[in-house]
């Protein structure tokens, strides 16, 4: 049966055109119920013992997905009209529902009501799309009732009063979410139910029992129409809000319209915005802007703490450019400072797109009696200090007080000091190492599930070995006769020989994006048979590789470069320590050791040449733990030692990445995946310049060459070559005009993409279709994180790929850091110690120190926390010094001090490492 859909649209050229689409209807679409006597039961997904089959409307799925994911909710028919609406409204929820539908252990069935002759409905004249879709849901529910008869009850679940009223009038069984959940006899499930806004908990009952305290706390958000108009007129400014990780009362919004970051100070000015929200901001009058000063943040926060009855554990200053405004600081006693040095400050007037998701943390008991029916109200405190407390209601308060739990945000009324949310699930006991490690993974959206059977089926059977087909492949060079040894050389495992585009293995790798390295474990991007066997370049074992081969002069000048897929047989698999020991042992003169020394000599010349071009040679503190093999607790902590062998490998890997970047860009100028490092702005470097000046150094920051030994805060990112002009390809830190990632396809999906591009440039294989077809969206877009806020508009593969990979790369880094922080807390809780530290930043009530022995950076307070140091301590900004008013004691930037490190818990369930001056 054929139906025609027609509509008119406006083209980009401004023309109006009529579009006609054919819509085919069928009468042989299965219902999915085993009890059916008409349909083919081999296609049944629902339980044969089901007494009730649920049909959910769109808003129920949108708002109750946490409940729906609970195993108690099963035997569900998911209508295609609901899926279509979800795809347009919330891709994250859409993907979660699709996962339920494809899960072999859940009983969810997708019914294509929009393509069934008896359930498709046309929109009536004057009927809104929402009303038409509600009617389609009721029609499909009625069809199921007639189709299955008395064999099973069909129940429509909806919280829409009008939809429920019409359903009952039409003879359909219908219930609200709460009513149905109560009928299940599992009271704990009610904690998962999101209350409709109109039925939310009364503010008086939760926040204050005195009606006089009920007042408007936040300004009303502007409607989108007013926000859009204000953005066009330049009254409002759009950007992503980022909350200071160490001061949750301070945030900033990067604004392209004014070319600067707008400081948002205080919860009132944040106006219910969460970290990561896309917001509209209105600038405050200039006399209210904050002036850049080296002042105490904690003191200013204290004013807000008293004003808002909060009790946050606020650190002295942020220590990452990702966590705080570039030059943000609060206005201090010198209020008459020149406004020329003030930073733009503003307030949030509207939320353009929310970044709400689930959060890990614990409950803070509230001095309120349990409600009727055992309902208790509690405040949830997130592990992420940037997130405000969230109020929830629960029927299992006693079981949750000592647990790490997950809570989702539902709403935030302007009459409420806190947002409202609901309990999702329990992670485990507070303080348990496994529980806290799982929190790290959840907070950073790390996929640690086991590889599915479909993914593992893509792997070749073990034991695997190089076959005669590989050796006879004209596109693969036999290098087994060449002396090859692995200290991670330019011969890179040929991962793409086993990871083919469009397979479940490739889909899984693309969604994971990268391997994640925690202190006690590694979460692989690819299954272990590949990472630890088939693609591991072992000694005396034949392996497939993708090789970069250079011809070089003794001065490390590259004469020629070629690339080939190869077969190698490594004569040695050396660790960095083993390679260094060989090079250092003058008694060894064997060919392998001689090769190592020759390569090291070349690497030194290559490194010097990079430095001469202006490459930055900055070392970051990498902490190394000694872990107990039985308890997995840290036994010792120290800095990771970098050897010449590490630098040798680094140079050849960098050279390989540069060579591959040049090759793929030459062949695919518009669709190469490259990596760039933007040049930092002067504002980013101001703190460095002040510090250098204080110790008598005058830095020239006009070029990377002049700034080769300085810090910068720009972050290297992936990008598609077709999206930027060639001058923007620059990798500032490496002083390389072109750069990509090729050398680690085992642990980075970016390298897998580059391998495919390189193979296509060599005509070894065809370029995957998706690389050429820019409007296509791949399964990568279906991953949860690509659905956050600013990525929802992405509709092109090459638009989404770099953004997604950058997101995954950053999350992996943040998870690694969080794991280090967790194990640092575990270690110093048992081993408090005294050690040396170097002052790196000065503040009026203390300073930030770096502890070289442990790679730790943190605040040291000279005054009581909350005291801004006024009177007793004075800051000399010119000399980067904090001193007593009488001049008897002073501390300077880069000065060594002795400190005490110990773990304290100023707030329940929030342990932190405290640094105290001795």
Please identify what each model-predicted range represents.
Residues 1-217:
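Noncatalytic, typically N-terminal accessory segments of nucleic acid-processing enzymes
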Residues 384-386, 411-414, 429, 433, ...:
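Electropositive polyanion-binding surfaces
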């Amino acid at each position: 049966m054929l139906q025609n859909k027609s509509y008119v649209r406006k083209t980009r050229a401004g023309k109006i055109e009529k579009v006609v689409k054919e819509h085919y209807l069928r009468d042989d679409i299965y219902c999915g119920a085993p009890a059916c006597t008409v349909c083919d039961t081999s296609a049944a997904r629902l339980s044969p013992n089901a007494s009730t089959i649920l049909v959910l409307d769109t808003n129920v799925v949108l708002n109750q997905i946490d409940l729906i994911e609970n195993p108690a909710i099963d035997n569900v028919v998911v209508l295609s009209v609901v899926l279509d609406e979800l795809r347009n409204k919330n891709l994250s929820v859409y993907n979660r529902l699709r996962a339920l539908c494809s899960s072999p252990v859940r009983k969810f069935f997708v019914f294509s009501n929009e393509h069934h002759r008896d359930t498709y409905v046309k929109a009536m004249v004057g009927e809104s799309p929402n009303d038409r879709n509600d009617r389609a849901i009721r029609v499909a529910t009625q069809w199921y009732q007639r189709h299955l008869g008395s064999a099973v009850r069909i129940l429509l679940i909806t919280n829409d009063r009008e939809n429920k009223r019409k359903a009952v009038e039409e003879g359909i069984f219908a219930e609200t979410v709460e009513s149905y959940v109560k009928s299940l006899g599992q009271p704990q499930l009610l904690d998962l139910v999101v209350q409709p806004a109109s039925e939310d908990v009364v503010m008086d009952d939760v926040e204050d029992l005195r009606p006089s305290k009920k007042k408007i706390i936040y300004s009303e958000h502007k409607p989108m129409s007013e926000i859009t108009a204000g953005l066009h007129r330049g009254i409002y400014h759009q950007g992503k809000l980022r909350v200071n990780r160490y001061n949750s009362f301070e945030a900033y919004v990067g604004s392209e319209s004014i070319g600067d970051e707008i400081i948002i100070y205080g919860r009132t000015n944040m106006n219910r915005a969460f970290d990561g929200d896309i917001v509209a901001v209105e600038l405050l009058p200039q006399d209210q802007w904050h002036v850049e000063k080296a002042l105490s943040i904690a003191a200013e926060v204290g004013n807000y703490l008293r004003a808002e009855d909060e009790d946050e554990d606020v650190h002295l200053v942020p220590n990452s450019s990702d966590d705080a405004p570039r030059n943000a600081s609060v206005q201090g006693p010198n209020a008459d400072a020149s406004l020329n040095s003030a930073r733009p400050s503003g307030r949030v007037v509207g939320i353009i797109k929310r970044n709400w998701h689930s959060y890990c943390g614990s409950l803070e008991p509230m001095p309120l009696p349990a409600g009727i029916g055992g309902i208790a109200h509690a405040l949830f405190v997130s592990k992420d200090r940037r997130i405000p407390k969230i109020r929830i209601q629960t029927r299992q308060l006693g079981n949750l007080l000592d647990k790490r739990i997950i809570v989702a945000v539902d709403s935030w009324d302007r009459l409420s000091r806190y947002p409202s949310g609901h309990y999702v699930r329990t992670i485990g006991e507070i303080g348990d190492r496994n529980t806290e490690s799982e929190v790290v993974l959840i907070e950073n959206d790390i996929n640690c599930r086991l590889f599915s059977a479909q993914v593992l089926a893509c792997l070749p059977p073990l034991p695997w070995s190089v076959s005669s087909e590989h050796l006879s492949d004209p596109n693969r060079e036999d290098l087994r006769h060449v002396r090859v040894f692995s200290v991670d050389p330019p011969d890179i495992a040929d991962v793409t020989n086993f990871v083919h585009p469009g397979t479940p293995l490739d889909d899984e790798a693309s969604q994971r994006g990268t391997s994640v390295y925690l202190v006690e474990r590694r979460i692989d991007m690819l299954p272990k048979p590949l990472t630890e066997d088939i693609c591991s370049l072992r000694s005396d074992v034949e392996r497939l590789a993708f090789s970069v081969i250079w011809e070089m002069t003794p001065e490390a000048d590259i004469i020629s470069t070629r690339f080939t897929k190869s077969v190698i047989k490594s004569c040695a698999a050396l660790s960095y320590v083993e390679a260094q020991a060989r090079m250092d042992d003058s008694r060894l003169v064997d060919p392998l050791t001689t090769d190592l020394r020759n390569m090291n000599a070349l690497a030194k010349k290559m490194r010097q040449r990079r430095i001469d071009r202006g490459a930055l040679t900055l070392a970051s503190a990498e902490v190394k733990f000694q872990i107990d093999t039985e308890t997995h607790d840290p036994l010792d902590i120290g800095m990771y030692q970098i050897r010449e062998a590490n630098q040798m490998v680094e140079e050849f890997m960098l050279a390989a990445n540069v060579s591959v970047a040049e090759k793929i860009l030459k062949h695919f100028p518009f669709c190469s995946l490259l990596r760039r490092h933007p040049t930092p702005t002067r504002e980013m470097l101001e703190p460095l310049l002040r510090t250098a000046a204080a110790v008598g150094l005058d830095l020239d920051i006009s070029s990377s060459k002049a700034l080769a030994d300085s810090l910068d805060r720009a972050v290297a990112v992936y990008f598609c070559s077709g999206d930027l002009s060639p001058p923007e390809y620059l990798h500032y830190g490496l002083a390389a005009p072109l750069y990509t990632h090729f050398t680690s396809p085992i642990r980075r999906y970016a390298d897998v993409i580059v391998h495919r591009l390189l193979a296509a440039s060599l005509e070894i294989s065809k370029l995957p279709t998706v690389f050429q077809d820019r409007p296509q969206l791949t399964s990568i877009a279906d991953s949860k994180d690509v659905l956050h806020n600013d990525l929802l508009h992405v509709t092109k593969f090459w638009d989404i790929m770099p953004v997604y990979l950058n997101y995954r790369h950053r999350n992996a880094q943040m998870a690694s850091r969080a794991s280090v922080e967790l194990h640092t807390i575990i270690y110093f809780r048992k081993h408090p110690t005294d050690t040396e530290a170097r002052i790196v930043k000065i503040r009026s009530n203390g300073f930030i120190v770096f502890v070289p022995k442990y790679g730790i950076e943190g605040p040291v307070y000279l005054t009581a926390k909350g005291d801004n140091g006024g009177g007793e301590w004075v800051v000399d900004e010119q000399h980067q010094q904090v001193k007593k008013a009488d001049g008897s004691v002073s501390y300077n930037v880069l000065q060594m001090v002795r400190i005490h490190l110990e773990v304290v818990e100023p707030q329940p369930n929030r342990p932190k490492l405290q640094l105290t001056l001795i």
